[in-house]
């Protein structure tokens, strides 16, 4: 059953049961003091409201029959998946650079199985959800995401998570190139960097690549009364 979500730059209509809510990298690394972003010098002090908003969005999406996909960014314990000096990721990943500057952190940042890699305690995938590891910023790179979505007839993706200007935007952009409709819930995302970075990422998304809404509006669009209005 179709519903319409109020968004910028215009409303967008979608079928929740042919849509997915994507939770990007809500790991200790990105959202918890003592995690990678914090150790690399980024401010994570305002991530708690984002976690609560994601909980709300996930609950509403699951009740409406949306597929929930959780991403975890990181690599194997030996960092083979991160790429060596021949990979730009080796030179640009702030996690890898932080470990090179602080050797005592080697093996602790974004390594599979580590505390840093784990999802935050408040966000727990449920049976029927899909959890995918990803080795780069985009959730489409070297993952089965595209195949999972296409096999289910899913064309609309609603994004939450961290960081708005890095992995969220990268995944939404790649989805745009693959003909997916991408929506970001702005109060369920958080940037890596100053506040203007969040605004710039959202401007890019709503102007060139997708749509921007918020959690309260999203939940309202999934309420039974909204479906009744469309019907």
UniProtKB/Swiss-Prot annotation:
Its EC number is 3.5.1.110. GO terms for biological process: nitrogen utilization; uracil catabolic process. Gene3D superfamilies: Isochorismatase-like. HAMAP family: RutB. It comes from the Bacteria. The active site is at residues 25, 134, 167. Hydrolyzes ureidoacrylate to form aminoacrylate and carbamate. The carbamate hydrolyzes spontaneously, thereby releasing one of the nitrogen atoms of the pyrimidine ring as ammonia and one of its carbon atoms as CO2. This is Ureidoacrylate amidohydrolase RutB.
């Amino acid at each position: 059953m179709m519903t319409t979500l109020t968004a910028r730059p215009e409303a967008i209509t979608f079928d929740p049961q042919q849509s997915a809510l994507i939770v990007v990298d809500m790991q200790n690394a990105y959202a918890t003091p003592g995690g990678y972003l914090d150790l690399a010098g980024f401010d994570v002090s305002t991530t708690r409201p984002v976690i609560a908003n994601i909980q709300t969005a996930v609950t509403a999406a699951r009740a409406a029959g949306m597929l929930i996909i959780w991403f975890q960014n990181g690599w194997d314990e030996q960092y083979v998946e991160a790429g060596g000096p021949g990979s730009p990721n080796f030179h640009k990943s702030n996690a890898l650079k932080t470990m090179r500057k602080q050797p005592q952190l080697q093996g602790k940042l974004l390594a599979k199985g580590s505390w840093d890699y784990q999802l935050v305690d408040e966000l727990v995938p449920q049976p029927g959800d899909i959890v995918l590891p990803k080795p780069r910023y985009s959730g489409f790179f070297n993952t089965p995401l595209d195949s999972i979505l296409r096999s289910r007839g899913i064309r609309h993706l609603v994004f939450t998570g961290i960081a708005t200007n890095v992995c969220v935007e990268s995944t939404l952009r790649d989805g745009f190139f693959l003909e997916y409709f991408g929506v970001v819930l702005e109060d369920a995302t958080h940037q890596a960097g100053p506040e203007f970075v969040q605004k710039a990422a959202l401007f890019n998304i709503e102007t060139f690549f997708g749509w921007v809404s918020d959690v309260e509006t999203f939940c309202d669009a999934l309420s039974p009364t909204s479906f009744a209005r469309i019907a």
